[in-house]
């Protein structure tokens, strides 16, 4: 009997006993569980499943009164079904310890998309981006920024640095369900309640030429009249007094701005301006809450109830300090600091031309649009993870682990989702395949080698190898560097450099021979080390030299030692030796010549002559 069948038989026996007795004890459950299940959480999951079958698990055997409440059921089919389910759960519990299996299993639960499903998700991505654009269009300076970029294009800058396309309003795109209201209006307040659930649920193309798109977005009917009729940098008080016509013009600007598809760099610049304003606002609000709640001991609930709509009312803290509350006196001491923070909020309102509520509303609308686009992109990515697996399998054994190939392919998949244009008519998988292959091959070229080689050099090496194989088939032998250079139209020196770079490094621990006791590093010569023969020869020469010098007089031996630096740090000139002996340099030369004549005598020279041959 196989291990799995035996395991299922034991579980079936356990469940049958539980149904006959009406209960099980923890000891009985523990005796019947497989030995490899020891995690307390896994045991709790199994006991919970047994309880779901109607079998109670007790610390010890219950009394007779408790057993009367349980109905014994020994249905064989029910026991087998329960045992199979429990065995499957146990197998699943063990399987979840492997992150790769978890990834594969969760990936398999997502259904593949049809062409219509891809279009629907792509439209949701566009709709989310349109909502973001519509929200930031109401932020002061946004339209001015776009018109400034349009002027740069007219002066010769590349349009592709500003726009990536234009969403045709006449196309069958699912338009936003409602217009994006102007922040601060009643319509915006009403829509805020309707979108609360949308925001909380998120934790976190045949296109026209861009030139025509930007020209359309800067129609004279709005953009030319825009600076003169009302300023994008007016203060909040002036904006609250807008006549209805100017409000419609502002909405028209937002409507024109929404279809524009900016390049990511330009899009991020505009979004970052809104985020920066909100971060400055939040920073001051947190400082005020810290002063009130932490320092003045004001209840947090009271602060959250009283502070909204009083962000820029500099009399707010003073009025609260006059109340008869436990924290009023402490709040009065912090009044100056609170007013200073409120003054910074007033300065922010003056700088942006928006009230605090309007800044929050613009950011809320922008966050909702980003959440919609992010969710749609996530669905598109998850539905195509299997495509990455199928492509990554073709690039195994090229220097990167399979999981690394999958991760690099997923990066390419996410880029494909960002750049997919469903209006061109092809399926997403057709388009994404090239992005995934590009990401995987680039990562292999960039990371697979121990010594990194630039990607352009990798491409040259691959081309060289391909042509070398072709020439090998044509000529029946390996081509020479000269022949390769002629075929590739490259200098011979560069061909030799490429061939040298193309060599793969090997480990010094590579086994050599059948016994594998020796390694490649054992056979590599260390050029910095002296050979034993050379060291022995030098030592013998030193000993022979000392013996020969010992046959001279002490004065002659010392002169020769000083002249040639024997047993000294350096040699000496005749002048230096003469000063040592307090004689002239000529006398030292005579002593040296006499010592040389003695050394040339055959009885002494024969000891040193043998070293000349070595």
Curated annotation (Swiss-Prot):
Q: Which residues bind DNA?
A: 574-593
Transcription among the record's keywords?
yes
Question: Which ranges belong to the motif Interaction with polymerase core subunit RpoC?
Answer: 404-407
Region of interest called Sigma-70 factor domain-2, as start-end residue ranges on this chain: 380-450
**Location of the region described as Sigma-70 factor domain-3 in the Swiss-Prot/TrEMBL record:** 459-535
Q: Where in the cell is it found?
A: Cytoplasm
Task: Quote the cellular component terms of the Gene Ontology held in the record.
Answer: cytoplasm
A single BP term in Gene Ontology: DNA-templated transcription initiation
Point to the regions of Polar residues compositional bias. 215-232
Sigma-70 factor domain-4: annotated segments? 548-601
Which controlled-vocabulary keywords does the entry list? Cytoplasm, DNA-binding, Sigma factor, Transcription, Transcription regulation
One Pfam assignment: Sigma70_ner
**NCBIfam families for the chain:** PRK05658.1, RpoD_Cterm, sigma70-ECF
Family membership, please give it: Belongs to the sigma-70 factor family. RpoD/SigA subfamily.
Query: What quaternary structure, including any partners, is listed in this protein's UniProt entry?
Result: Interacts transiently with the RNA polymerase catalytic core.
Q: What is this protein called?
A: RNA polymerase sigma factor RpoD
- Which species is listed as the source? Pseudomonas putida (Arthrobacter siderocapsulatus)
Q: Which gene encodes it?
A: rpoD
